[in-house]
Amino acid sequence: MSGPDKGSDSGQTANDPKQKKARNGQMETYSCARCRKLKKKCPRQLPECSNCLKAREPCNYPGRAPRRTKKELRDAIMKGEVLPSMRRKHRKIEKELKTADLRHLESVDDRPVNQVMGGSMPPLGAYRGGEQQYNNGPPISGIDGNDSINRGKAQSVGSYQILPPQRKSKLVLDQNPKFVHSQSSALKTNEYPVPIMSPHIANQVYPEGVSSLISALNTMNDNVSANTPIALSYLQLQKLHQEQQQIQQQQIQQQQQHQHLVQQHLQHVRADATSILPPVTSQTVYTPIPGPRTSQIPFGFTHGYTASAPPPLMQPYSMPTSPFESREKQQQFDNIQYHPVYKIPPIAARQSPIDEIIGIENGSISIDAGSITREVVNSRMKGPHSTSWVNEDGSPKPIKKSLLEKFVSAYFEHNHRLFPMVDKVTFLKKLATINSFESIEMLAVNNPELPKTFIFEIYMIMAIGCTTLQRAGKLTTDEGHLYEHLAYLAMRNFRDILHQQDITTLRCLILLGIYSFFEPKGVSSWTISGIAMRLAIELGLNRPLTAKEMGDMSAVEVESRYRVFWSAYCFERVVATSLGRVSAIDDEDIGIPLPRALYDSEKEDIEVTNLIISLRKMGGKIYKEVHSLSAGRKDITMEQKQLIIQKLRKELDDIYEEECEKRRLKGKSRSSKRFEKSKESDSDRGVTEEDVKSGNENLIGLLASDDVSMTEHGQSIDNTLESTPLPTTIPTTIVNDSVDQHSTLENIPTSATSKDQIETIITKPTANIMNDQTDSDPLPKVDNKPISNNEEGPKSLKEGNSEQNPSENISPEDVTLTKTDNSENKESSLRSNSNISFHISNVWLEMRYTQLQILLYRPSALIPKPPIESLTVLGEFCLAAWRHTYTLYKEKLLPLNWITLFRTLTICNTILYCLCQWSIDLVASTIEIQQCVEILQHFGEKWVFAMKCADVFQNISNTIVEISLSQGQDPNIDKLTRELFGASNAYLEILNENNVDVSWEDRFR
């Protein structure tokens, strides 16, 4: 502020009576803050005014803000600061700024405006107008850069904008060089003119530098007369404005058309799924339609960036190889197709086919349970890679309804017994309304109320049933691979299911988990099991229902809750136990009853379900008390540890004996019913009592077969012999400290002098394993005489075996070396009449019993180095478990999934440990080792490392044969020792290299 101004201000202040009273201490100079806020007259008393004193509010005198100079006021106006009042000097400053800007506009040169505005206009410098014409209207601000109006003068005044007069008069400095640079760069290319927005759009928030031009033109439209010379140029600008509006409308229409085409294309792709999409390789790429690139134009300044024209459609819109394809490859493709300037990105970038299936939109995950679950499943689930269900021309093959019905029937006959979460009656009623495979997808279209869960359940149940029939050998090669295609179609409906996060989501997660058993790696099963169990706990399915909740639900709904939870429990527990990991829920946190049968027809299935639950509970209990970290921290004596083992052994024996007793009684009841039916029809069919007494069982069985279901026939096969005892004591042929290490080789006849003869003798029982079983199987016979051991076992098994024929009394000559035509026919007949479900088989029951015994006795955190007595029992259980496993394998009743593979590897690892500890009969174990090799080689078709493990055991078998030829000489025993330890190390290296994550406590040295 100048000198005279300062003097005048100071003089006015000195003569102010308020200042005099303030100096005398009578009152404050200015009002308090509260009175200012309430707009009341403040008495300004000290220390508090009467207004604040009455209101009992604090009184604060802030004083007066310091006065600003003209320069400070000018800077404030330029910065757009709202001034408290508009005095004369303020208006004077604003008028000076307007006048300077008008002079700048009138002195502009004769450059064509179309270099700046993209239009065809006379130069603005050709017109002159008085200052009075512009008093009520703001000037046009310049745009910095090479294409500005008289760049030098624009920079001298400053690039600023003035808001329309309907708002408060203020000036806003344009200080956004980034946007100015982008605008000037776009103008230099002459790709598109800068749009001039209509007045009704002018209230939007536009980027700086552009809104000044738009605001100025909108203001001139209201204040400039059409008769003035400058108005002639404005009319042309207005015409240009209208042209830009038309261009904008065209762009909006193109955007809408593009979105419409995208929606039609996606609907077309979904419709193609009803006819089974052909397989697509990973080399399929999305190719844009060739054509000239549309010039860039600022479209909608809401987002503050330049958007290009609508992107072209991608051709062809091929489906991916798998719904679980790796996201890394898809992300690389998205980076090529997607450009950040697109306001609406292309189809491939906005939502890839994989993301459409799993449900990840725009490559981002919202923070909710459904989205997180989708991303987790997408990252862990590998899924099917291709399908062979196509013709040579690539068109999908038709699927017969009868084949699909077989898949569904196989699921409910086998898998439903383990996981009864699907309401069988309701599901089959809905399924009966489907006439053909092509109408499955149309169900959701024609019936919007039909949930996507039903479509998912249909496809996934058929996929799981297909794996069951494939294992049983009841499908052709092409039909056997159809499960991958069905699972692919099921995952197309998985996105909407995860959003629900309810009991239907849990049911579908369990189905997906069952299917994941057949993946080469079990990581997805572990992930899905954890998600499923957490969702079950979140829904409160493990807690008992209150009386009010029970009253609001029907009996079917209550039972459905129980079954869904126990299905999730069985699924999670089998995964955790197979991997040697802790379970997600403790048995003490479960307060609901076991499933019960609602219909008479499902009593047998529910009995199997409850047996499975008991075995799952037992496996979890063994892990918790023997293999967990807390078990290893127990500071107890060896006697106390053995008591824990004995207690668990007794519980396991009780479960086994109770189930055997049920099956024995059920078998007798069925046998008597069949005999009565056959006896009643004997007179009509010509069968006499002499035929029955003479043992003409084949004729009776043939006549009775018409009235016996497949399930009963499968059960009768298992009940032909009573179960034999399992080993609990040390056999005399077991190598230990009190027995000569070379006595195990004494069973080899002295006449056997060649390696081929030794191999023939050792592998004789393997040749007829299905017809001439080994000693502890319920079905095995050699010359129609059961083979069994003399060791004591569970009471229920021991009582039923009056006849015993120890294996050591059978010479090698009693066993045929090769299969005859009769044995082949017998094996084929047995397989054709057997059921696809093995849970009613005694062989399966004994296999699971021995596997749990292995889990109990093997080296653990509780007992890292078991005594020799325990190792002897462990070795016998390993051999028995392997015989049962091989029996189911030969009968095609062994599921070839990663659960079975990991159990197999556990047995193999334990056998190696026992061999290194000399607790298994070498010659007796050779049979089981050869069986290990055969099964591991079969698993090698999908799991490559299983083939390498088979080679390790083959080398061990060859070494044992060489030692047998040498009659147990010491150098060869040393060679075997080195071979065993070397094989053990190689075995573990193979598992580690292939990331086989199984928690084992075995230490071979």
UniProtKB/Swiss-Prot annotation:
Entry annotated with the keyword Ribosomal protein: no
Disruption phenotype: Causes a modest increase in azole resistance but does not exhibit altered susceptibility to cycloheximide or caffeine.
Residue ranges with Basic and acidic residues bias: 673-693, 792-801
Subcellular location: Nucleus
KW Cytoplasm (keyword) present: no
Chief subcellular location: nucleus
Entry GO MF terms: DNA-binding transcription factor activity, RNA polymerase II-specific; sequence-specific DNA binding; zinc ion binding
Function: Transcription factor that negatively regulates pleiotropic drug resistance genes, including the ABC transporter genes CDR1, PDH1, and YOR1.
Protein's recorded name: Negative regulator of pleiotropic drug resistance STB5
Annotated source species: Candida glabrata (strain ATCC 2001 / BCRC 20586 / JCM 3761 / NBRC 0622 / NRRL Y-65 / CBS 138)
Lineage: Eukaryota, Fungi, Dikarya, Ascomycota, Saccharomycotina
Gene from which the chain derives: STB5
